């Protein structure tokens, strides 16, 4: 009972987060890239995003390591927590990804994840029991076939030392594991059982490399854990030690239900440029299906104090509850398989440039 009062179970944390989890962004236009990172045990980017998420669209991490990473890498990386990727890795690891950069995809990602390489002992962590079997959950925002290589740091590794390939030993490789939930939907994930080595205690790190078999693109994930008899509890994030509250409820809940993933359509959000009192943003609409997407619409609620101005390559409407819905225009109505289109907008803002809760595809 004492242990349960000190820890938050990851399942409870995920249930609270995923009800209001914001979709993050992917730069560019044309080919749709995959997304994915470890959710159990939670990666640094996943748990820091959970810790930082608020009900206003602002990021306010309570964990000092997450705060430092946000200061170093900015909001773009944290909102894009499931895109620690290298488009050209092709299964390469040691000798290709430099030591000290494993948690940022060798600094080859389109996004700046350098801050998540920091060698420090105060990252959010998952509490595990040596010799037990856990179920790994790995986000499937864009599902693709391939292998998941799972590594564990060797005994004696310290979280305050740089993470290198010599610190790791491969403990499992899983090919095409099953999935729960839809790709591109809140909570959707791959899952499989992982037998943890016996005789371990203290701090460790689980490193995963997702090697796609249909592309050269690979994903990288660093999950801080401690072998102390735990059962998947998470500490070091907002609400630790009591009832989990990673995402405070907005003072005025929206009357319009949050958007849901629509078929193979996925929407990803980007702040292109910002200035005092406003910003320029874009939304990429991605088709992860095998058939053309004929017509699309995207819905979100802007951050508190944010008002959309002009919109191009899309047709906007505004709800009475503050939500925004943008539909296709004639020239970008059809999105080809594994393709994407992008619309842009300007907005006035008091600093909350990102959406409150989820942005997603809805019926046109």
Curated annotation (Swiss-Prot):
Domain of life: Bacteria
Alphabetized UniProt keyword annotations: Carbohydrate metabolism, Cellulose degradation, Copper, Metal-binding, Monooxygenase, Oxidoreductase, Polysaccharide degradation, Secreted, Signal
Biotechnology: The purification method developed for LPMOs can be a cheap, simple and fast solution for the purification of these enzymes for industrial applications. In addition, the activity of SamLPMO10C shows the potential of LPMOs in lignocellulosic biomass valorization.
Residue sites binding Cu cation per the record: 35, 144
Alphabetized InterPro entries for the sequence: CBD2 (IPR001919), CBM2/CBM3_carb-bd_dom_sf (IPR008965), CBM2_carb-bd_dom_sf (IPR012291), Cellulose/chitin-bd_N (IPR004302), GlcNAc_Chitin_IntDeg (IPR051024), Ig_E-set (IPR014756)
Biological role stated in the UniProt entry: Involved in the degradation of lignocellulosic biomass. Catalyzes the oxidative cleavage of glycosidic bonds in cellulosic substrates via a copper-dependent mechanism. Degrades phosphoric acid swollen cellulose (PASC) to oxidized cellooligosaccharides with degrees of polymerization of 4-8. Also shows activity on agricultural fiber paper pulps such as flax pulp. Is not active on chitin.
EC number of this enzyme: 1.14.99.54
Gene Ontology BP term (one): cellulose catabolic process
Gene3D superfamilies documented for this protein: 2.60.40.290, chitin-binding protein cbp21
Organism of derivation: Streptomyces ambofaciens (strain ATCC 23877 / 3486 / DSM 40053 / JCM 4204 / NBRC 12836 / NRRL B-2516)
Record's protein name: Lytic cellulose monooxygenase
UniProt main location, coarse: secreted
Cellular component annotations (GO), alphabetically ordered: extracellular region
């Amino acid at each position: 009972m004492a242990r349960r009062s000190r820890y938050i179970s990851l399942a409870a944390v995920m249930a609270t987060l995923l009800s209001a989890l914001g979709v993050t962004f992917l730069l560019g236009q044309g080919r749709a890239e995959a997304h994915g990172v470890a959710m159990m045990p939670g990666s640094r980017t996943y748990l820091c995003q959970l810790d930082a998420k608020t009900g206003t669209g602002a990021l306010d991490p309570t964990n000092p390591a997450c705060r430092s990473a946000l200061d170093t890498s900015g909001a773009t990386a944290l909102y894009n927590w499931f895109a620690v990727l290298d488009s050209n890795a092709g299964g390469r690891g040691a000798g290709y990804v430099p030591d000290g950069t494993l948690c940022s995809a060798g600094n080859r990602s389109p996004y700046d994840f350098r801050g998540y390489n920091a060698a420090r002992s105060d990252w959010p962590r998952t509490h595990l029991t040596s010799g037990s079997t856990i179920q790994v959950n790995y986000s499937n925002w864009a599902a693709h076939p391939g292998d998941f290589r799972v590594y564990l740091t060797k005994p004696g590794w310290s979280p305050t030392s740089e993470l290198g390939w010599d610190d790791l030993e491969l403990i499992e490789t899983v090919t095409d594991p099953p999935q729960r939930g839809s790709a591109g939907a809140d909570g959707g994930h791959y899952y499989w059982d992982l037998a943890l080595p016996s005789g371990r205690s203290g701090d460790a790190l689980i490193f995963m490399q997702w090697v796609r078999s249909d592309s050269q693109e690979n994903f990288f994930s660093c999950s801080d854990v401690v072998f102390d008899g735990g059962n998947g509890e998470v500490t070091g994030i907002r609400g630790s030690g009591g009832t989990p509250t990673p995402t405070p409820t907005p003072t005025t809940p929206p009357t319009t239900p949050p958007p849901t993933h629509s078929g193979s359509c996925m929407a990803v959000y980007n702040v292109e440029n910002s200035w005092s009192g406003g910003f320029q943003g874009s939304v990429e609409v991605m088709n992860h299906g095998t058939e053309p997407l004929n017509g699309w619409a995207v819905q979100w609620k802007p951050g508190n104090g944010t008002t959309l101005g002009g919109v191009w390559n899309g047709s906007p409407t505004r709800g009475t509850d503050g939500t925004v819905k943008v539909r296709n225009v004639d020239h970008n109505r059809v999105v080809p398989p594994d393709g994407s289109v992008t619309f842009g907008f300007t907005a006035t803002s008091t600093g909350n440039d990102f959406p409150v809760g989820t942005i997603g595809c809805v019926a046109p």
